[in-house]
Amino acid sequence: MLKDGKAYAYAAWAVAETEGKVPQYVKRQCQSWINIVDDKDPDAVVDERAYQKICKLMQLMVHPDLHCSIYEGLEDYAWLFITATLCTKCRDADERYYITALLEIARKNFKTFNSAVIFIVLMLTEPAFSRFFSVAPDLSLSSELKLAIRKIIKSSPALIDEVDPAFKILRSQIICKLNDNEYTPLAYSQDTMDGKLANAFLADEAGALDDYPVEAMRSSQITLRNKLGIIISTQYPNDNNVMIDEID
């Protein structure tokens, strides 16, 4: 059950923590999610079937650095981030409750890697012909997500079977052959963000972006029922960036 997992345990620890390690707004968000899991929220519930499916997929994915399953190697905070994002549903509809997943965290905490796990799960489970994008200040940074996805796929025999691989990795995109879902990295400095239809998108290092890339991605999702935007960043020494707007 979800209550027995690392996501719920981490949320409970964050709420109870008294040494100043957890910011107050994180505590409030964790308490809000605990209320959902405990069936105390009038608008949202957790989907146990979706949770079980995600756990099985993570058991198939191999961590490229730890050489164990993603299920075993994932950090506790990442379990909460991924589980809350993908398994929290609207009570009156089979749609994700959260349409934005926001993560501000210090460097070297695997935020792009954890986003890659979410993207692989989505590419395997979303409806056929779904499209996914990452946006960042330049193509090199935007392609960090592609690199992380590629490393996980290449390390996971179940995903890269020589006879019938689940994914096709191209220079400019990654395609899930099971359903023709595709992921493409975009660069704010080179690519127009308009005219895309993003079932899900990642804004990486949002502290170095203005609001145009995120708003363009969101505009592309207007007609979609089950949409998701993941916005991640460390802190940047400027007052004009989309991360500050999202936190506010």
Regions found by a protein language model. Name each.
Residues 1-248:
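Phosphate/NTP-binding elements of NTP-utilizing enzymes
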